[in-house]
């Protein structure tokens, strides 16, 4: 149930999230899984039910003591009933080890009363950008994500690729789809965010979600007319797409999924667009310019057609923009020597002319969700293997009537073709939207030696993942 009501305040400033920063090359914190005052599962940090932004440099170590303070018996429902209130952490997008005590979501699991001790070693050559952390207990991931158990991670150093951001005011915006399915005043909440009836797909359905930004419904973001700011936006929704648009202004995208655009194409470090699709788990980092103060302006999401079998993703306002002073952030790298920017521009010719090394086909029926006809089982053998030090050509095939965002742990991939047609601007991603009845071709980057071990790939509509649309991959 949504933690805000239709009678709540409007024009509340977007919350400034607490931050945890590096001290002597180590970031340390204690995070709790608990139940908040609204009865929802929640992260707690320093006595508050809020997830901090974790800021870390390449080469640093992240230490988290994660304590499961959830009750033994849950009052909520899960895809695999009954809920066990088990939990763990996934460091989404980070190119780190899948083995304990790092990004192990298969064997590291905390039951109520247990504590997990994470020691995550960020490689010194890790790309800078926006990443995030969220729980990943198979069968209960959707419920915990919908309750808001997620937070942002910033790997410092974006100014190496885009020098302008060094002196820009930065906004970290965690956007979550919140359920209003059982909220008595749901219609009033939809009016508060100017939600429009879905007009791009399932017109007969009413959306059961509204979006919050940093935990607030339709907050205010301060930006002066003509002022340039650096916005880092994560779609932390369990099952909702965003199609981001800024009134009166374009978005100058500089990074997607924590990867600077310059990483693949140094000559084109920015992409200027009217709006941008961000699937669940996707991230967008953009320079924005404050709109003219003479007219109302907002950050909004447009309607997204998710297919005849998909859920409605209605257009609505995410945040209002208001004139207001902001202070440039102090550069984080003042006393840190970072490596020069690295680039990885692949020659795609050999991949385009070859048959895929692996094809992942996403299907669904009334009994569940599948990859290559198989439902995920925790004790199953890996569906595929990859030799560390290589690239692989993968094709993702969506044989269903709804969109699926495909995510793989530990690595990024270069998405270069959709439905067999070469994309004009290939991009490095860790989560890609796969169109209804369509295909996406990608080059998987398995060259990093730290990824050795058992990992996962899955649909990031987490209800689909919970119900079987996930598989193991062994990096060897």
Feature roles, as predicted:
Residues 2-117, 191, 195-231, 261-263, ...:
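N-terminal, post-signal-peptide metal-ligating segments of extracellular/periplasmic oxidoreductases
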Residues 31, 64, 89, 135, ...:
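Divalent metal-coordination and catalytic microenvironments
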Residues 56, 66-68, 234-237, 246, ...:
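Non-cytosolic beta-sheet module surface loops
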Residues 73, 80-161, 267-324, 404, ...:
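Extracellular/periplasmic metallocenter environments
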Residues 96-111, 182, 188-340, 421-423:
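Histidine- and aromatic-rich segments of cupredoxin/plastocyanin-like copper-binding domains
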Residues 247-261, 399-427, 462-465, 474-476:
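Active/binding-pocket-proximal capping segment
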């Amino acid at each position: 149930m949504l933690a805000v009501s239709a009678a709540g305040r409007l024009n509340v400033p977007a919350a400034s999230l607490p931050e945890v920063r590096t001290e002597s090359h180590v970031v340390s914190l204690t995070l709790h899984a608990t139940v908040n005052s609204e009865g929802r599962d929640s992260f707690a940090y320093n006595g508050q039910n809020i997830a901090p932004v974790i800021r870390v440099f390449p080469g640093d170590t992240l230490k988290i003591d994660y304590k499961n303070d959830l009750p033994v018996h849950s009052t909520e429902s899960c895809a695999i009933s009954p809920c066990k209130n088990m939990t763990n952490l996934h460091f989404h997008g980070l190119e780190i080890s899948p083995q304990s005590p790092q990004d192990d979501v298969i064997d590291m699991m905390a039951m109520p009363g247990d504590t997990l001790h994470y020691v995550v070693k960020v490689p010194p050559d890790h790309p800078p950008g926006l990443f995030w952390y969220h729980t990943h207990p198979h069968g209960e991931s959707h419920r915990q994500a919908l309750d808001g158990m997620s937070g942002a991670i910033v790997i410092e150093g974006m100014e190496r690729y885009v020098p302008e951001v060094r002196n820009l005011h930065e906004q970290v915006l965690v956007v979550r789809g919140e359920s209003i399915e059982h909220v008595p005043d749901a219609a009033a909440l939809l009016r508060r965010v100017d939600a429009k009836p879905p007009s791009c797909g399932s017109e007969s359905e009413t959306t059961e979600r509204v979006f919050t930004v940093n935990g607030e419904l339709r907050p205010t973001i301060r930006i002066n007319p003509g002022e340039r700011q650096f916005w880092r936006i994560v779609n932390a929704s369990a099952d909702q797409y965003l199609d981001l648009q800024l009134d009166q202004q374009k978005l100058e995208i500089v990074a997607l999924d924590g990867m600077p655009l310059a990483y693949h194409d140094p000559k084109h470090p920015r992409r200027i667009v009217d709006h941008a699709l961000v699937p669940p788990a996707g991230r967008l980092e953009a320079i924005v310019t404050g709109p003219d103060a003479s007219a109302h302006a907002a950050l909004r999401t447009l309607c997204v057609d998710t297919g005849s079998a998909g859920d409605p993703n209605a257009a609505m306002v995410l945040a209002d923009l208001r004139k207001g002073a902001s202070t440039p952030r102090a550069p984080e790298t003042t006393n840190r020597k970072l490596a020069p920017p690295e680039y990885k521009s692949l020659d795609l010719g050999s991949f385009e002319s070859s048959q895929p090394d692996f094809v992942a086909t996403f299907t669904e029926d009334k009994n569940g969700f599948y990859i290559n006809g198989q439902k995920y089982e925790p004790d199953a053998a890996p569906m595929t293997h990859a030799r560390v030090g290589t690239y692989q050509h993968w094709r993702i095939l969506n044989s269903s009537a709804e969109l699926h965002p495909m995510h793989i742990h530990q690595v990024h991939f270069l998405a270069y073709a959709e439905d067999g047609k070469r994309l004009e601007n290939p991009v490095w991603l860790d989560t890609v939207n796969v169109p209804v009845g369509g295909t996406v071709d990608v080059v998987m980057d398995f060259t990093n030696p730290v990824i050795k071990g058992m990992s996962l790939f899955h649909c990031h509509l987490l209800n689909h993942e919970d119900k079987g649309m996930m598989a193991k991959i062994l990096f060897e």
